Amino acid sequence: MKKILILFILIFTSCENDYLDVVPDNIATIDLAFNTRTTAENFLSTCYTYIPEHAHAEQNFAMLAGDEVWYYAENDFYMNNETSFRVAKGMQNSSSPYLNYWEGGRGAPHSLFVALRDCNIFLENLVAVPGLEEEERLRWLDEVKVLKAFYHFWLMQMYGPIPIVKTNIPVGASASETNVYRSSIDDVVDYLTELLDEVIEADNLPGFINYIYTEKGRITMPIAKALKAKILMLSASPIFNGNSDFSSLVDNQGNSLVNQTYDPQKWVLAKEAVLEAIESAEANGHFLHQFNQQLPINGGVNDQVTQELSLRTAITEPFNSEIIWAFSADWTGELQQWCQPRWSADHSALFGYTKKSHAPTLNMVETFYTRNGVPIDEDTSWEYGNRFDVVQTPIFDTNNENYHEF
């Protein structure tokens, strides 16, 4: 019996294992994402989906992570914000960070390194797609290059020195290959500007969008040049240009990650990039928004009200001429609801829409300059000492016009 058992084991251990090395049918591969124009365009759309929602108070750290606005509570009947507002309250931490665009989570819907990986996959595989014209292929490639620069830039704004993701690390890479170093701010900026210069010189992007119902929000040449200008402006700013506060920020190879010597030439480069971006925008139909709609008011409105409406609708009117890059998937209605005050009890029917939560602090209000262009505590014609006095708003202004009419 023992001999039979040994023979049985030897027979089965000597069999070949090739029958296990079979890939099942109908398994999706990366090739399938680029085998038609439609599937390739879907992958292009995927590269866009990682764009953070700038108007989303919980996703954009610039919205509430400072003290420009403040909530009376982080949770109430109308809204909740337990991410960026907690950063403003000093609750940011390293173990489970808020607005974690590094890994995704805590207010950040995605890891932007995943976004960069998808961008690289697209750039590596959009080679010969059936049904895709060469002109369109080149445009798509440059769109994704700009997105790649944008995602790097967003990470740099949040974390300073970051790893540059030029190409994807293979899935089967060794542990040592996956341990990448963060690059210095100067190296990151150099790489991003080189990437954008490559796009600008190739001139494959449109100057403006013709098909507004299907392509609004897609990358254009003014967007690429504006992004380059923003990157160079941040590089030239005191944050990363000779900032001694970052003198101890070095990697384990002893390399300084933020340059410690102020370089005025960075402002020259930034100025040139800004001028080029402005010229490109103006040449492609972008200009300061002006309110020019007809209002059902006898005699119309005066210049002051028109100016106020121009400032207001520059924010609220979608895809107006002043906007260089508007992301069509972004939802701004909630932000406007949070900002909307409740003027009186007569508006009780609108209480579900006017949430009165997003408001500037008095500290921010006092930083505004007077009409003479100086801080309020330096303007001798402004009664700084009486700034907290309660005053009655007049029904009519100096032009004898009803203050509340509009």
Language-model regions, residue ranges each:
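An aromatic- and glycine-enriched ligand-binding surface/loop that stacks and positions planar moieties
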Residues: E16-T83, I162, K166, R218-P222, ...
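Bacterial Sec-dependent N-terminal signal peptides
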Residues: M1-D25
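Short edge-strand/loop segments of extracellular domains
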Residues: N168-A173
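Terminal low-complexity, poorly structured segments
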Residues: M1-I6, N60, N75, S95, ...
